Amino acid sequence: ASDVYKRQLTYDKFACNQYLKGFGVRIAESLLLRGGQSVTDEDVMEKIGLPCFIKPSLGGSSFGVTKVTAKEQIQPAITKAFAEAQEVLVEAFMDGTEITCGCYKTKDKSVVFPITEVVSHNEYFDYEAKYNGASDEITPARISDDLTRRVQTLTSAIYDILGAYGIIRVDYIITEGEKINLLEVNTTPGMTATSFIPQQVRAAGMEMKDVMTDIIENKFRD
């Protein structure tokens, strides 16, 4: 795939996940609805099942996301998601531990940060949990050394597959049997003091300014 195509991919959750699935990355079952396209409650129940998440396919910040637990919630959730974006994703719910891992690469090194475990006080990691502190973020995550290595290796591989530049953050959910399932790739992760990447940089014993300098200097090298 061309670099332009891969960069466009990362802005579209559905397309990006489907692309990575072709490389053997595990993802949730999902349906994509475009431009007001409708789907019956029965189709959602049969193809995806409940509970499920209905959310905009483009963008971040968890706006317009609904966790659907009953049939009568499906259509209102689709309407809510379409108010935020032209494409809507209906995605199977996966029960497990949510984690996230950051990574950046320069011409002479690859840096994969310690993993953060996300424990939301809400039913899922929504806008309130993400921005208003309604979650516990534990870095490094309380997972085995073997699983940590596997997640970091996969994060590095995803970076390469997508031809990423600068810092990316990859969100996963770990399901029974330590199975690693991709949630989404963030190519423009938050950089505020409480965001995941600065937490991971600190946990790695690094300084954010040094990381940014590294990336900027790398850009200007031949």
Label each PLM-derived region with a short phrase.
Residues 1-5:
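Short, small-residue-biased leader/transition segments that mark boundaries at the very start
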